[in-house]
Amino acid sequence: MAQNQSDTAKKDVVIKVRGLVNAFGSKVIHDHIDLDVYRGEVLGVVGGSGSGKSVLLRSVIGLIRPRQGTVEVFGQKTDEIEGPNMHRLEMRWGVLFQAGALFSSQTVAENIKVPLREYTAMGETLMDEIAAMKLNMVGLPPDTGDKYPAELSGGMIKRAGLARALALDPELLFLDEPTAGLDPISANQFDELIKRLQKALGLTVFLVTHDIDTLRATTDRIAVLVNKKIVIGTITELRKSDDPWIKDYFSGVRGRAALADMAEAH
């Protein structure tokens, strides 16, 4: 399902992936894949176990060097910049890793201030104010800032991690399995939070997930990693695919339920 040139020509490309090959030893994960992510959209990334969803995310943000191909973020090739230039680029995105990745020895507020300390010269008072503001933004009470990660529920850890990802007011947000491990109610609430923040802040979101309900609730388009390649479309478009995995995922019981929910919402 190729990207339609006439539909996309005027869109601002935030992430541009071309000819990407990722491999570990002789095992090829991604085989010459192309992907564009447009400003202001929520792109979901889904695929079976071992399809390399998180590997793709880490390739985009420069944590994994691809064997072949190029990755551009905001028009800059991530493998060609370093030092201060890379720092300036990193300040334009925020990342929420799957487990929250909070430092257990620091309070939630201190965790939120980590990127502020790393990338800015802000004073302590201003950092405290920003940490409090970000907690409020993700729906956590003020006293959460004084707690340690071990004192938080799974849903609160995800929200605290999101607050840290938003600390530098990024334009681009990477979310790696944001609802994994959450009960259905908490997952639904987190989906609603993502969509609300995306609209309010004008974010571009790159969202890795296995959850079709999250895809339905939050995404504009979906990139499916299958057979080392990538297929891109909406849920409705992907349901028409002849690929067995895609057909089963989007047209199975949960896929049909998600589509029914979409129809009711409209």
Question: Which residues fall in each region the model found?
Answer:
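Helix-to-loop junction immediately C-terminal to a conserved catalytic motif
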Residues: 61
